[in-house]
Structure formats: structure tokens, C-alpha cells
Amino acid sequence: MAAAFAYRWLLCAAGIVNVLPIGAQRHTASDNPSTYNIGGVLSNSESELHFHTTIAHLNFDQQYVPRKVTYYDKTIRMDKNPIKTVFNVCDKLIEKRVYAVVVSHEQTSGDLSPAAVSYTSGFYSIPVIGISSRDAAFSDKNIHVSFLRTVPPYYHQADVWLELLSHFLYTKVIIIHSSDTDGRAILGRFQTTSQTYYDDVDVRATVELIVEFEPKLESFTEHLIDMKTAQSRVYLMYASTEDAQVIFRDAGEYNMTGEGHVWIVTEQALHANNTPDGVLGLQLEHAHSDKGHIRDSVYVLASAIKEMISNETIAEAPKDCGDSAVNWESGKRLFQYLKSRNITGETGQVAFDDNGDRIYAGYDVINIREHQKQHLVGKFSYDSLRAKMRMRINDSEIIWGGKQKRKPEGIMIPTHLKVLTIEEKPFVYVRRMGDDEFRCEPDERPCPLFNASDATTNEFCCRGYCIDLLIELSKRINFTYDLALSPDGQFGHYILRNNTGAMTLRKEWTGLIGELVNERADMIVAPLTINPERAEYIEFSKPFKYQGITILEKKPSRSSTLVSFLQPFSNTLWILVMVSVHVVALVLYLLDRFSPFGRFKLSHSDSNEEKALNLSSAVWFAWGVLLNSGIGEGTPRSFSARVLGMVWAGFAMIIVASYTANLAAFLVLERPKTKLSGINDARLRNTMENLTCATVKGSSVDMYFRRQVELSNMYRTMESNNYVTAEQAIQDVKKGKLMAFIWDSSRLEYEASKDCELVTAGELFGRSGYGVGLQKGSPWTDAVTLTILEFHESGFMEKLDKQWIFHGHVQQNCELFEKTPNTLGLKNMAGVFILVGVGIAGGVGLIIIEVIYKKHQVKKQKRLDIARHAADKWRGTIEKRKTIRASLAMQRQYNVGLMARQPPGTISLAVDKRRYPRLGQRLGPERAWPGDAADVLRTRRPYDLTKSGLVPPALGLGKTRPQQNPLPPRYSPGYTSDVSHLVV
């Protein structure tokens, strides 16, 4: 309140001065001035002398002063009365046309006098360079429009705090600050800078508690009670020297300054007379070196004026405080040039930020030892090679609270932890206790469902990979625990939820992660995959098991189809074999037919010589050789055909041998292959209707697919198929309802080793690991990580793998099952038997067709025979009549011839050669050859013609066997009725 009242008086005084009738004169020139007055409001005569000497030396430094330019100093003494200071600035500095003012003051006199100089000079746009003022108020450019300083403000120490926390790896802190402007400024600076600072470092510090107190403390006990219940034991304090004494006094009474507690304080608090041992504090380098800051401020001003002269025209500075209309634009431009300076001075690297505050200021890190001795243990200084600030700490020189040499953990480490897990075979098996059970088995641990509001009894027992890991961890790093199951059975994912009474969406975690983020649990020991989304909100130990993502599917069925015996050859090869059989048969037939030794028989050849090969016999021969059946007949006769037959036999031998060998490979040693080749399988990337794949909703695998742009199409397809738990998905894979389940490789490899019908497809992708989850900034993170690394080195993790995941005996049985030849059964060879059955049925069918066809042919032949018999009978009747007529005519002529005693002539008769035809001989008359009567008699059937007088007995034809019912001969005139040729 006093400071605000004083500021109002300063503003009133500045207004009074502005209306004084002193008279104003403006000066503008096209050329830059050759002389420049630099004002100084200094605290003592020594500073005034040094200011005068510095400007005198500056005039001889051609690097900063152009030719024909001279600097002059105009100084006044800083008055503790700010109103007097305002009048002195107007009368003794502005009236002398000063282009800038350098101001310093005694640290004990307060900062009101520099503020008066800043107000007055700023009204006329005259730059003011402070060399001792460090209050946060001077950073407000709405008030101190032309003020910049070669010393940093107090609240810039927050930057050094962040460097120290990063160096000591402290992740959780408590900030103690006063409620004044500087106290709130340092808190704001810490929170703002940490947002960008921690983007470049691995360790992020969070503020667990903020303690704000009113200045001029009398007691700090009430705040210490809250601080003691917090987890953090690192205190960052901004307080005045007087307030720091009260805080240290009360903190000592609560034993909060001893072993395990870390205090990092600002410059003012470091000078308290009761600062505890082990406190770390900051001290600005050259903080009390007015000479160094005077020199740096003068040279910064000279550098800015030189650059401004080379770039633009500088108007003369204002000369009168009475002219309120003065607007010195050159002063505003000069202030911008000053802020852009970056030079190496006596106090280090001198540069300014947008507020005109010094940056690159160096700090000493002070460690308080016994009897309030200050010991330098580090520096925060500018690194010219990297062009940035760098922290250097000698850790071995630090004495911590309680006179400890070892760095405290910085947090209160609880020894009894709330540990959560989740059912996930083989890492965690969950068993419900029976009604008659009162305790779990020795290798099990009680694990009730986690419910903060319901103290349920231990109804479940847990065992497995993670439980054994938890038991061993608790032994190694010495903590006790209460184990509980996930409240909703999920690992957890974040959802957007509306805040009550607000329009904004808030990201909220569920499941195990949610309990850890909300600090309702201390640790998660489960197959928890490490991924970026989770690592942003919780801590992870180093992986206790490395794994990735893979695909689980059911093996293709090993049962053979009815045409399994055809598998050794491809369809193309079978077609070629079938074509080859008939082509070879055709060529054999042609070779045997056109061979001179195949078709024609020799004249002297035996009648039993084998006949030439016909086409049907050639086909039979080709098939017989191919099927290795005996060939009893129908073999090639020619040499060329027999050569081809031998070649065909060799071909058949190779084909049959190859078929037999491949048949064994397909039916006896067949090993099923996976359907999918991996995540890059085209059927997964372009999912078809008959291929379903899924994962678990909200899991790490689900998050992985969301991150991968190239898998977005696949994720959109599978999103609707995702399951709530992995157990449900695995059961559906076994039942064949789900073709591919995408999940952590450790679980799927376990399932595949347990069930020989399951197999993992393709290579691992999305490689990661399982880690122990802890709260952000948990004190157990490092201890758990180091212990897990020791477990890896000692072989303990490998032992857990063999015991719980791989199940060596089961996996060996699966491999034995895969390598054991299948015993051929009816299912394997059913096709062959069916083929034989088809052959038998075909043969029976063909014989039935043949019988039916034969019956039809017999009936047809019978009808033809009847018709032929009728025709023959009719023809016989006609011929008989013709024969009788011819016989009568011949007899008459014969009789006439006898009477004329002429020798008999030749006649042509058609007679039946035999009375009874031979078997198979066609019925009907045959044409006899022309001849005499004797010829006729010789061809007639034995008949006694002596009675008829036609043939005398002397012909010697009487020797005939007796005939019953002798029939007369039938004469036929050779199928013609013309008998004119007959000669008697």
C-alpha cells in the first residue's frame, strides 16, 4: 500500500513539473548531432567519478564512437525523496538535452527513486538504463515505457530453478512465495517457462503445492502442516530476508530442514541469519559491482547510437519539461536499438529481452555450510560456444540437509503401496475363492476388486508372471503393498467428457491408468504396454518384457478332401498326362499301320501271326503301360512303334514314381500353413467381407492403429469388430467366428504354445515392451527400473518366461505333433475308393447299356430275317415256276433233238448246288456255269435219272447214298426268263 501511495505522488509531481512555464524550444536538424549528453543519476560520488571516467575513455574508443562524435556526462545524485528526484531530472538533466539516463541507487533505500526517474524520462521517451533496480514492476512497459536494465529482475531466478531441478532430476516440488508483485511474478515465470523448457529435456518437474504468504510474516506454522503432508520434499522459496528468517525458524521446529529435505532459495532469502545447513541459494554475479554495470550501460548506449547514426537521422533530445506536447520519436527508436544490443561487457554477456530486462546474467550457486558459511558449488553462466546459458554443478561439494553427502530423493517415499493389476493370462491368473476357503495358495496373493468406497473382502486370488515379479520387487526394494484388480477390467484409455456446468471438454482416463493419474493407486504391475499416450500422464519403468504386436489365427484344417490323391500334381500336369496318353496311343497306331512290317502279312507267313495294332488296342496299351498293368495282347508289331512304347514306359515310370513320392509328402507329412502373411497382407489392408479381424477396445494396440496413418483404412473396418476383453476374442478365434485377432505377442505366443490349433502369423510389428506403471514423479521409479535391470542380468526374467509363457513341455508336444506323420485313413484315401466305385458303377452301367442295345439289335435283326425269309420264299416260288417252265422247254427240245439224232448242245441251267444249304449260307438259287448235260448231271444232287430216261446208267453216277423223299432238281435259267439261248 505504501508503494502504491508513493507511486501516485510521483505521478502528481511529474504532472506539476510538466506544466511549469519554463519555455520550450524544439530543435530539428537534417544532420545528426555531433555531441551527445549522457545523464547519470547515481548513488554516490565514487559512481559519479567512474561514470565520468568511463565516458572520457569512450570518446577514444573508435569501435564505439564514430568520427566527429563526442559524448559528455551530466550527473546528479540520487535523492531518497522521489519528488526531489523528479525536479532534479528536469532541471539538471533534461534541460541539458540528455539522450539517455543511467540510474543507480542504494539497495537499502528502496526502488522508488529509480521509478521517479523512469516515469519522468519515459514521458519524454528518453531511454533509462538501470544498473541496480530488480523489481518486477520495471518489466511493465505500460508504466516504464523506456526503461531497461543491465541486471535481471528477481523473478528471472525461476529460470535457474528449472536448471537446478533438471540437473538433480527432481520431478515434484513445492513453491513458497510472497503475495507481492515479485512473488507472484516468479511463480508465473516458473510455470510459463517450464512449459517450453521441458520440451527439450527428459525430466519434467511438476508443482505439487503452492504456498503463498503475506509479507512481514510472524508465523509460518499453518502452511508447514500442509507441506508436511505433501509427497514432495523439494522447496523453492522466494521471500525477503526477514520473511525467510521466520520460515526457516518454523520449518526447523517441524524438522523440515534436516535430512531428506531440499531447500532452494533466492538471493534475499539466502542472507537470512538462520539459514539451515544444506540450503542451496542463488547469487547474481556482479550484483554489487556498480562500476562494471556503469561501464556496460555506457557502452551499450554508445553501440546503439552508433548503429542508429549509420541508419537514420537522430533528432536532438528534448530540452524542456514544460512542453507536454513533446514527442521525441528518436528516443523511441533509440530504445529499440538498445534492446537489440548483445555485447560482451565486464559483467558478462549483455543482452535484453522484449521487456528491456537483462538476459544471459550469470549466477553463483551457493551452498550454506556450518556457521552460515557460503560455499560456491556451481555456476550458471553464458556459454559462448553454444550461445546459451549453461549450468555447471560440482555435486561432490554439496552438503545437503542433515550434513549428508548423498543427494536426497526429494520426495517422501511411502513404504506401503496400493498396487493394481488386471486379469491377463499368463501374466495374471484370477481365481475366485471357494466358500470354504479362507486364504489363498502359497503362490497366490489376495486381490479384491478395487473400489475406493467399498471395503470388500478378499474374494479373489491372483498368481502368474506379474505376481511373481511383484513379490520379488517388494523383497528387493523393501516395500509392502495391497493388491487389487482393475475396477472396470480394462487397462484404460482417455475419453472426452463434459465438465459440469462448463462448455469445454476434458480428457479423462479410465481403467488402471485412470486410477494412477487420479492418485488413487501407487503402482500398476500388469502387462501394461509402454506407449506415448500413456507416458504423457504416468511414469514407466524400464520394460520387464520386450514384445510387439502380432496376429493370432486358427490353423487351416488338416483333414483331406475326397480328391486329396490328386494333390501331388497340378491341374495342368494332370491334363498334360491325360493328353499324352491318347497322343501316344494315336502315334502308336499310325506307326504300326503304316509300317511295312505291321499292316501287310507275308505270303508265306503263318496264319497264326499276330494282327496289326488297331486304334483301340493302342489306347489300351498306352493306359496299361501308364497304370503298370499287364499287357497280354495288342502290343506294337513294328520296330518304330515298339521304340516309342519303350520311351512311353520310361515316361510312365517317372510319372508314377514322382506321383508316389509327392503323395506321401501331401498326405503323410503335410503341415498346414497360416492364411495370413502378416500385417502387410493385402487381405488385411483391403479387408474383404469373409475376413474379419479385431483387437481390444481402448487398448494399446487400438491406440497404435489410431496413430498409424497407413493403417487407417484397416482400423475403420476393424473398429466395429473390436472386443471388450482379449479372452473373448481368443475364444472366437478358436470357434472360427474371428479369423484374425491382433494383440500383444506375449499373450498370443502363450495361446499358440498352449493350443496346437492356433498359430501366430507374420512378423512382429509395433515393437514395445511391458513396464511397471507409477505416478508422475514417483520416488519408486528409479528403484523399480534398476531392480528390473538386475532381474534381466540375473536371468530371473528368463525364468519367468519359461515358467509362465512358453510352457516348454506343451510347446514341445505341439512340435512333435507337427512332425509326426499322419496315418492314412479312409478320409485320406476315400477319393481312391470312390474312384474304384465309380469305375465299377461305370462298368455295370456300360454292360446294361450293351445288353439293352444288343436286345434292340436282335429284335431288329429278327425283323430283318423274317422279311428276308419272306422275300426269299416269294423269290423261290417265282424261280420254281420259271424253272419248271424252263425244264419243260428243255425237255421238249431234248426230245426233238433225239429224234433228229443230233448231238446234244450246251445249255445253261440254273440249279441248286445242294439240296440242303450249309449253315450260314444265304438261301436262294445260284447261277450255274454253262456246260453240257454231263456237267449238269455232276452238279445235281444224287438222283436216279435213269427212270426218267434223261441220263443213262452208263455215266457211272449210280453210287449215291440212299435218300429219303428224294426231291427233283430245281433248274433256274440264271435269274432270267429268256431261254432263247438254249440249244438242243
UniProtKB/Swiss-Prot annotation:
Intervals, Extracellular compartment: 25-570, 670-828
Gene3D superfamilies: 1.10.287.70, 3.40.50.2300, Periplasmic binding protein-like II
GO biological process: behavioral response to ethanol; calcium ion homeostasis; chemical synaptic transmission; ionotropic glutamate receptor signaling pathway; long-term memory; medium-term memory; olfactory learning; phototaxis
Chain positions covered by the region annotation Disordered: 947-984
Stretch forming the signal peptide: 1-24
Cellular component per GO, a single term: NMDA selective glutamate receptor complex
Name listed for the protein in its UniProt record: Glutamate [NMDA] receptor subunit 1
Matches recorded under Pfam families: ANF_receptor, CaM_bdg_C0, Lig_chan, Lig_chan-Glu_bd
Subcellular location: Cell membrane; Postsynaptic cell membrane; Postsynaptic density
Membrane-spanning parts: 571-591, 649-669, 829-849
MF GO annotations: glutamate-gated receptor activity; NMDA glutamate receptor activity
Glycosylated residue positions: N255, N311, N342, N394, N451, N478, N498, N690
Family, per entry: Belongs to the glutamate-gated ion channel (TC 1.A.10.1) family.
Membrane-related topology note: Multi-pass membrane protein
Ligand binding (glycine): P527, L528, T529, R534, S700, D744
